Every structure is written in structure tokens, then in C-alpha cells.
Amino acid sequence: MYRSCVVRARKRTCVEPWVIGIISFLSLIVLAVCIGLTVHYVRYNHRRTYNYYSTLSFTSDKLYSEFGREASKNFTEMSQRIETMVKHAFHKSPLRGQLVKAHIIKFSKEDDGVLAHMLLIFRIRSTEDPETVHKIIEYVLHEKLKYATGPPNVDPESVKIKKINKTESDNYFNHCCGTRRNKSTVQTSVRIVGGTPVEEEEWPWQSSLRWDGSHRCGATLINNTWLVTAAHCFRTHKDPSRWSATFGATLQPRKLTTGIRRIIVHEKYKYPSHDYDIALAELSKPVPCTNAVHKVCLPDANHEFQPGQRMFVTGFGALKNDGFTQNNLRQVQVDYIDTQTCNQPQSYNGAITPRMLCAGFLKGEKDACQGDSGGPLVTADVRDIWYLAGVVSWGDECGQPNKPGVYTRVTAFRHWIASNTGI
């Protein structure tokens, strides 16, 4: 049996105007409160960057000559110790979590010790009074460093800080070797062979060497007047006046262009051998240090890399064997491969000399390629400072299994570089 559907007429209800008014009023109050809370939250949590230049005196059981040279192993160790002391001081302070970076830029000798020059960068709520912030920073450094355990032994009373602007802060950073201001893609594993372009300012020491205006090789800026590159780049093209160097993440447009005054090819390089494949190019004029253009660090001659250590190689080279030069700079993450492994019969069968190093993967795929020659292979230390480990030299095609990229080992030529450039 079907049930019939009963339809009842709805009684229309009228709402009094005063009720509508109350509802509208309450809605406006709720909306105003929400807007106020949002504005307060944004304003309270908006942070302003504070840059400071700081100095502090310290004494050490090491001689200044042992750690005073930028980028040396002892310089890195001393810098890390002092930076760690400063970070710990702020960790137990009202500014906990607001110190973004403490970075030693240099040491200078004093009569009764050593002066550390340091940059401090904070991200602090914009509601805080700048004068109050300055006083808190001074107080923390003066009081908390009293409890820092050395070595080195810092003098908290010697601490001085000076507020500087972003331009000044960038200028200090850019005169330090191996610093990178833009690192948005450093964690990605992309390839030069089939990879994606990097962003401007990511690898500021990368240079393009051009013969009559056309890209021929990569190179690496090691100070404002010298490039390191591969000797084979100049095998048939030796006239410095026809060479130029450009900087930036694209071949066109160029960020900066300068001429080449002098080329120094290692005296033991003899083609077709790949040994001693290193050269220096002196720029016709010093290049200014900016976020987009500045030098990499050079490792000590006795520095040793560890198997599996992460490195990056960059260049404008081809995406595949016998391919074309790319307009955009590319990067690839590779691993350091020890010489014994690289000299196995299935790899290079003893061809790797003490002046070479291998980096890549035995499974292939990720590698440098034609047009990348002379470019940098770099690795970072514990302070996130980047060092030139190798110079793109040679390999068996590009990205082939058991045929990793072969690079000129920079540590093997550290004294040669110093004798020719003073660096």
C-alpha cells in the first residue's frame, strides 16, 4: 500500500525590524573584533631585520699567525667556536630564537690579544623599540659571555656593537669568500645534464670565459682580479686580448663583463694528457664584490675530502653529450669518490693521478658536460662557507655508468696558485 504524501502549507513568519537591527549590530561587532585581532596578530608577529657589526677581544693558546688567514682550517675552527659562544649567549636570553646569524668576517691582531670582527643578524618583532633592542643585545653579550667556556677566552667587557643597514651588511658578507646570499635551490638534486636553471646570486663565483664573445669554458673567481680554470681551455686560443669573462646566472643578458689581462697555464700541462689541467686568468680590472659576484674560498693544501662528501658542480654546458651550450647556469649535486674506487678497471683503470679527483655517481646520470670545462666543483664546511674543491677537467662522455666526472684537484695546486697570485 502506498502512503499518500501530505502537503501542508507553511506559515510565513515575519521578523521584527528591531531584531534584524540587533543581529546586524552584533555581526558588525564580531567582524570588527576579527579584523582587530588579525591586524594585531600581523603587527605583533611581523618581524624586522636588525644588522649589527660587532667586535670583541679574546686570547687563545694558538698564535695569531695560525688562524688569522681567512678560509684556513684554523680560521674556520676559531670562527666556529666564537660564533657558537655568541649563539649560546642569546639562546638563554629575551632574544632567544631571534638571532638569525652570527658570522666572523675577520680577525685582527692587538697588543694584548686578538680582535674578532663579526656580523650579527636578528629578526625581531616590529613592535619592539629599536633602542631597547640595542640595549638588550649589548646586555646579553656583556653578561652572558662571562660564562662562556673557552678556548678561546673572550673578554665580555670589550664587546662593541654598531647598528648597520642592509647594504653595509651585504658589503661585509660579500667581501668574505665562499658566502652565498641566495640558496633557494641548494637542497634540490638537479643535473647540468637535463637539469633546471639556478637563480641569480646562487653561485656568485661562477664565470663564463669567452673567446671573441662566445662561451668556451667556465671559471671560478678566487679574488677580485683572478680566475681559476682548466688549462685545456687555452690549448688553441692563447691571446688574452680576445678573451673576456662574464658573470651572472645567464650568458645573455650579462651581469658583468671584463677583459683578460694575462693567462698562466701550468708549465707541466701537455696535451693530450689531462694531468696538470689548471690555469689562471688575470682580469683586466678588479670586479666589484656584490651579492651576484664575489669570490669562493680556497682550501688548505693539506685538506682531505671524505668519500661520499656532498659537492656541487655548476656550468653553462650541454645537457647531453655533444649537446649545445645553455644560456642559463645549471647545478648538479655530486658525491666525492675516492681515487682508489675511481681507478678501478671498470671505471678509469688507473688514469686518475694524485692531481685529479672524481665526483659523481657510479650509476651515472648526474655529471658535468661539454662547455662546463674549467668551472667550479665546490663543497661547504660546517659554517656553510663554500670552497673550491675541483676544476671541471675531463670524463668519458657525460653521465655514463662507472664514469664519474674527473676534476683537477685544487689542493694539489694550492701552492702553485699562491705563488702566481699571492692568494
Curated annotation (Swiss-Prot):
Topology relative to the membrane: Single-pass type II membrane protein
GO BP terms in the entry: cognition; proteolysis; symbiont entry into host cell
Principal place of residence: membrane
Annotated InterPro entries: Pept_S1A_HAT/DESC1, Peptidase_S1_PA, Peptidase_S1_PA_chymotrypsin, Peptidase_S1A, SEA_dom, SEA_dom_sf, Trypsin_dom, TRYPSIN_HIS
Catalytic residues (UniProt): H232 (charge relay system), D277 (charge relay system), S373 (charge relay system)
TM stretches of this protein: 19-39
Organism the protein comes from: Mus musculus
Domain SEA: 48-166
Residue ranges annotated as Extracellular topological domain: 40-423
Glycosylation sites: N74, N165, N182, N223
Protein name: Transmembrane protease serine 11E
